[in-house]
Amino acid sequence: MEQQQNSYDENQIQVLEGLEAVRKRPGMYIGSTNSKGLHHLVWEIVDNSIDEALAGYCTDINIQIEKDNSITVVDNGRGIPVGIHEKMGRPAVEVIMTVLHAGGKFDGSGYKVSGGLHGVGASVVNALSTELDVTVHRDGKIHRQTYKRGVPVTDLEIIGETDHTGTTTHFVPDPEIFSETTEYDYDLLANRVRELAFLTKGVNITIEDKREGQERKNEYHYEGGIKSYVEYLNRSKEVVHEEPIYIEGEKDGITVEVALQYNDSYTSNIYSFTNNINTYEGGTHEAGFKTGLTRVINDYARKKGLIKENDPNLSGDDVREGLTAIISIKHPDPQFEGQTKTKLGNSEARTITDTLFSTAMETFMLENPDAAKKIVDKGLMAARARMAAKKARELTRRKSALEISNLPGKLADCSSKDPSISELYIVEGDSAGGSAKQGRDRHFQAILPLRGKILNVEKARLDKILSNNEVRSMITALGTGIGEDFNLEKARYHKVVIMTDADVDGAHIRTLLLTFFYRYMRQIIENGYVYIAQPPLYKVQQGKRVEYAYNDKELEELLKTLPQTPKPGLQRYKGLGEMNATQLWETTMDPSSRTLLQVTLEDAMDADETFEMLMGDKVEPRRNFIEANARYVKNLDI
């Protein structure tokens, strides 16, 4: 963390516009007013403290969920300026807390780089809180001011003397705005806190839950920064080279940090950040890194004779197989684009990342020939598998061209050709598949029965995956292609429903299918196309009356409502095959009465770790997970 000019005072605070609009249209400022928006408030305040840390003035940040679900954030930075603001005639801290776009981030003299737009954060949080209290330790005095829904209810008061500096912000989210929930999720906050600690080398971040019955505390501090992050992400994988490669450089005011390490898996995980903001959609910095990596590895392999003269170069996918990498850049003027504004658009970031990374990576490969050879060998194996997969794909295409219909024989397709209303049910077992085919609405519902369990794609390369019949049937039915051939626009169905039995085998098949979709068709999950059917667990019959219960709690409630006599008959479904076509339609497939769970992707890093832990080669992480969670099991299927 570097020291910068210590001229962070009231004159650096620029004012752009008023606050009234925030309460009317909160979604424009924090994305939404659901749980996501609620948690966003915390980051708006924490980002201010992180900016102080990046500038070299803050070493400790403390986040507390109070007993009443309010939030307190404490840092030991310089303290928000308290002098009178020249243009506004009010204390600078009040301007920051009550005026939108007032902050020390706009003309570059307060901070070189910053994450969220400073001051947008504080004032928006203030506007969306029933109460906000700010305490500033600065210039030997303790200053305090209180606000209600964005309006100051006290002047800035001096309440004591101090021998240190820093800012404490306490806020209570407004239930009128956050009508869905004002309940904070500790794990969600702790995950992001850990990420921020990795990205801000050396800073000490503590998070504490003070709510009754939920008390816990975590402290995060990583001297290794993103190098430690890569080690953390690879902790349950077999690594190809012991030490992660770490590269840092600066050019034209842009700082680039890259850490990478190869493991023995078949997928790559690259996470990129700009000013600590996760650029989920990638961008120019990520593109520069990928270009540089492919070029450096191919150049090295040719110089050392590991790729023969007439052989083609390794592709980008080849050199990235089994790669875990973090790219973190600090940019004074980042331009974000893409659907969710999480894609970096600055063209200079591509060139600078490529140049700085390539130079250092070349040096690493020359100085570490053993690790370099292992990296090249992994790429060569990936290339061979890619060629085999290409042949398998071509074979599939050739077969398709020779057949009258190129759709799998067991697929009962729907008559509609409109993907936006079409649904594909992937059903466990032929018997349930038969009932589903009879019970469905043929106009928009297609059925694809699966025989047995599909291949665990976490442990296999693409060539092996493509030789598996069940996987091939799914790929052909969905129409999107997979991997580098994937094209979402070719999807034949906008609802893909996984329908399996409610037992352990059904859960296993569901996990295998989700692993396949996540690894090779991630966009169908990201775009909300994947659903899980909820077949009932019980059938309750009393005379001619038939009711269904989807879990034990529902069954309990249902039995309470029924008369004592005659005694109701109870059937627990062991599998989908026990239901006839009509029952399956009424309970699980009829859009007017069914329950579907949509599969969403909140945190790619978390999802990746979960699939690796559940489906990967290492047994130890799975055993640890089972030991830690065994006490929560309600239904044990032995």
Swiss-Prot record:
EC number: 5.6.2.2
Primary role: A type II topoisomerase that negatively supercoils closed circular double-stranded (ds) DNA in an ATP-dependent manner to modulate DNA topology and maintain chromosomes in an underwound state. Negative supercoiling favors strand separation, and DNA replication, transcription, recombination and repair, all of which involve strand separation. Also able to catalyze the interconversion of other topological isomers of dsDNA rings, including catenanes and knotted rings. Type II topoisomerases break and join 2 DNA strands simultaneously in an ATP-dependent manner.
Other remarks on this protein: Few gyrases are as efficient as E.coli at forming negative supercoils. Not all organisms have 2 type II topoisomerases; in organisms with a single type II topoisomerase this enzyme also has to decatenate newly replicated chromosomes.
Keywords associated with the record: ATP-binding, Cytoplasm, DNA-binding, Isomerase, Magnesium, Metal-binding, Nucleotide-binding, Topoisomerase
Origin species: Bacillus subtilis (strain 168)
Taxonomic classification: Bacteria, Bacillati, Bacillota, Bacilli, Bacillales
Binding site for Mg(2+) 1: 428, 501
One of the record's GO cellular component terms: chromosome
Record domain Toprim: where: 422-536
MF GO annotations: ATP binding; DNA binding; DNA negative supercoiling activity; metal ion binding
Principal location listed in the UniProt entry: cytoplasm
Underlying gene: gyrB
Residues annotated for Mg(2+) 2 binding in this entry: 501, 503
UniProt name for this protein: DNA gyrase subunit B
